[in-house]
Amino acid sequence: MNASAKFTTSQIRSDFLEFFKGKGHTIVPSAPLVPGNDPTLLFTNSGMVQFKDVFLGAEKRSYVRAADVQRCLRAGGKHNDLDQVGYTARHHTFFEMLGNWSFGDYFKKDAIAWAWELLTQVWKLPAERLLVTVYQTDDEAYALWRDMVGVPEERIVRIGDNKGAPFASDNFWQMADTGPCGPCTEIFYDHGDHIAGGPPGSPDEDGDRFIEIWNLVFMQFDRQPDGTLVPLPAPCVDTGMGLERLAAILQHVHTNYEIDLFQALIRKASELTGTADLENKSLRVIADHIRACSFLIVDGVLPSNEGRGYVLRRIIRRALRHGWMLGVRQPFFSKLVPTLVEQMGEAYPELPAAVDTVTRALQAEEERFAETLDAGMKIFEDVAGKASNGVIPGVDAFRLYDTYGFPLDLTQDIARERDLTVDIAGFDAAMEQQRETARAAGKFGGGVTLPAELVATLSPTLFLGYDRLQADGLTVLALLKDGRPVQSADAGDAVIVITNQTPFYAESGGQVGDTGVLTGNGVRLAVDDTQKFAGQFHGHVGTLSEGGLKVGDVLSGQVDGERRGATILNHSATHLLHAALREVLGSHVQQKGSLVAPDRLRFDFSHFQPISAEELAVIERKVNQQVRANNAAEVHNMGMQEALDFGAMALFGEKYGEHVRVLKMGDYSTELCGGTHVNRTGDIGLFKITSEGGVSAGVRRIEAVTGQGALDYVDAEEARLAEAAELLGGSAADVVEKIRALGQRQKQLERELEAVKAKVAAGATADLSGQAVEVAGVKVLAARLEGFDAKALRDAMDRLKQQLGDAVIVLAGAQDGKAALVAGVNGSAMGKVKAGELLSHIASQIGGKGGGRPDLAQGGGEDGPALATALAAVVEWVSPRL
């Protein structure tokens, strides 16, 4: 093998892509860690994710051969290596997968030949160090390895169904229970007999001697529901090779953490934490986690308490805890980003492009967790010390999670280091109890759930309201009174009316339900709200003002058009706002919730810090630019995959049907949405942001108004400005300058007032020093000073200490029925009397509390007769101690 210096991690990436480019492959960029074509998948966890639809026949690419280096993440859901990271030689949260692909073009012969050529001729791996496996019945692959490549039979291992079912094997790959599948052949590197472990298929195959470096999957069958395998008309090749594992071999090191990329990060982490031992497992954890966290943020994920954001938060906090273990008490994690950019920025230009966003997001999370990490660790140590049978109670693990922000796997991590376990069932029970409490608190009016037997008899309500506000022929399918199904209702009854069709929009997607009226055959129902039940039935909520109503009656419906009209302006504006936020703040911004009402809109979104006034102004301006552009608001109904290919944004965790509704406003915004909207963006008229603030960690909220509401808001602001100008005795144009002048005048007056207070205080303390009582050579003074606040009392205390020398002093300042207290001990009295104890004693007598250092303490309580009594008793309390 050539000297390892040639094969840096960067060179290996380049070699791989150049090699397959020379074999006619199109070089495809890495897909993001957040899958764009599958909202149900947490993260991209393998190279084939971005080609999934090609293999399934749902997508056709312009090429039949491809090669890529795919960034992958396994730290959540089914694929979760988090608890192993840092403690083993080869587990990572983030890793890179080298892959080459054939979509119905070349097959086994070329795939095997090229893999061998790259390994042995380009990277010069000794052929005698390589061992291969094939599926038990894949005689074709076996023969190719033996006859074409020349691998000795003793270094070709057949692997059968070793997972308890037909075709369930390490060497048989399948995408799902049905669909594309096929045998695979794996290439292993033999580290030599000085390393423990046996070849694949042997009892000790889990040792470290034989390391898998490349897996070549031959998709040649379509698995049927009955388990039979039907040959595919165009077999495909899917290969994957872990970059970190390969780099370890080519650089002559045994663990992935010893390769150049990781060593650069470990050395920087060592410098930041002051840890000299480069083998320290905590340094490995930190080096691994900075890659995962940085690229997640690059791909639009921010720390939060749900979904992908919570996985990111868990990884960050695990890294921070390992820094804490190394003695770090200041932010350090984000300082690794420049080193990461040096190592990986050339391969992934999106990383240096987003370096500011990555750094700020990590800094914000570090600062947030630092507030609770120390306290949480103290709680853990206390709990661990009391743990019986080596188990941390679930309720305590939940307290660490709920109060101190410790993810469960972080608590498990810490427990494992102390040979403890965590009561997972108890944790889950505590979590469920909190959810039940939240659900109970969140139910308005007790909530209404349709009985299953009623649901079984109903057909989904057909919504007619996209293009009309009035409709006839609304057949009553069900009536609910007091939450229970009834056959009829009378005038005065509060009811929910479910119909077969309706122009009324039922609350969903943040948009409030319509109001209006249902009429027919002497019946009149004022609809106060429209709700969706069981996800498919529109319930008109209101009170019968006239007539009697029964199941089967046919009604007409009229939606309140003015209210709906105002609502749709706000709904369409939220889409433009979302797009503007992503343009100004970054692609990490994602909707976290919304309220679309006729009088306002509220939009919650992921972002890690407050938005500046300048940024808000730019966001508002960009939305209004789109309003003035008067683009058509186009609605397209299409399949889910077609919508994603169309560029529509899907939210992770949302449930979408096979067919979806896409709203496209010009080239600016394309989102999935089932709500009602304007015809053109110009209909919105005007967009004004009224407030911005934080909702929870990593989630911000903007409130805004549109149309007439925006005009009313501007009118009100102008009226307030005019009133302010009148009060200041000038015009609106003079307001800022006059306020600035007032502020300067106020500061001047405050300085003058402080000077007067200082003179008064100096005079008061001069008078007080003569009132001190001498006890055992120490001056004892307790006095009340009218109008003195805590600062003035401390200033007086400093002067009295200088005047009295050895002294015990208590001062009380009374203002507005409250008493401020300061106690001080000076000179020889300091070893005998403690100011904190003295002040606590006095404060307790006047319904207050306080404390502090032995030489100075402060507190407060109620002003009144008890204060005079407490001050009079100071000499008596002090005397025995002197």
From Swiss-Prot:
Keyword field contains Ligase: yes
The entry's keywords: Aminoacyl-tRNA synthetase, ATP-binding, Cytoplasm, Ligase, Metal-binding, Nucleotide-binding, Protein biosynthesis, RNA-binding, tRNA-binding, Zinc
Enzyme Commission code: 6.1.1.7
GO cellular component: cytosol
Top-level class of the enzyme under EC nomenclature: ligase
Binding sites annotated in the UniProt record for Zn(2+): 571, 575, 673, 677
Domain notes: Consists of three domains; the N-terminal catalytic domain, the editing domain and the C-terminal C-Ala domain. The editing domain removes incorrectly charged amino acids, while the C-Ala domain, along with tRNA(Ala), serves as a bridge to cooperatively bring together the editing and aminoacylation centers thus stimulating deacylation of misacylated tRNAs.
Chain's role: Catalyzes the attachment of alanine to tRNA(Ala) in a two-step reaction: alanine is first activated by ATP to form Ala-AMP and then transferred to the acceptor end of tRNA(Ala). Also edits incorrectly charged Ser-tRNA(Ala) and Gly-tRNA(Ala) via its editing domain.
Name of protein: Alanine--tRNA ligase
Natural source organism: Stenotrophomonas maltophilia (strain K279a)
